[in-house]
Amino acid sequence: MLSTTRLLALSTLLTPILAHIALWDPAMYGWTDDPNQWDPVVPLMHLPFDQWWFHGYMNVPPAEGKFMTLPSGGTYNGQVACNKALTKYGQNPAQQTGIYACDGPTDQGGIGAMHTSDKWNSPDPVDLKGCAIAIAYESDPTKIKPEDFTVISVNHKCVWFKDIDFQIPSDLPPCPPGGCHCLWEWIHADDAGSEQLFHLAYRCTVEGATGTRPLPSHSQQMSC
């Protein structure tokens, strides 16, 4: 039987892992070398603009030369998880074997972090609101405004599985020198916990881009 001290230590270690979800990529603003990093999964609802914009990491850019690479006409293969340790960027392979975006110590797994009314291990979850990648053709993050971003790819089965694909359009124009900036956005409904906003920024580039037309003007998302 575990001692009280060991139980308390275990609960402390699990607390961040039972938080929420992020799309993990080394080109993320706020990325650190900590293989157990969890702070990018903290939700942002009701925070002032300067605290939620770029997740508050405007002054913590990715390392020089790091880009989220979006293959023109191809697929961006990413990983969403409630802790970096569960992804390929962790240091313990035994923690990376799960197929879901979060793990947990009970028979409910990591369902709480996914904010869905679907049952754990459901083969065909239906209460998922999807997440998206948006792009802005500006290399200087201080010049970017929310309205500069255009959504270019949506995954409607997000978040559920850890491995996630985003189909990238084939007609995107090349990024400017210094690259583009991308966002990962997820707003889950309030039917499984309070409504929350998840928002992370990345330095990105479009590999093999040959498009010549600028992206269409953005419009406010609507239910359909």
Predicted regions and their residues:
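Membrane-associated scaffolding surfaces of BAR-superfamily helical dimers
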Residues: 11
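Short glycine/proline/serine/threonine-rich loop/turn segments at secondary-structure transition edges
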Residues: 174-180
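Peripheral, solvent-exposed domain-edge segments
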Residues: 2-6, 15-167, 177, 192-224
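Extracellular beta-strand-rich recognition modules
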Residues: 78-80, 182-186
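Flexible gly/pro/ser-rich segments immediately N-terminal to CXXCH heme-c attachment motifs
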Residues: 171
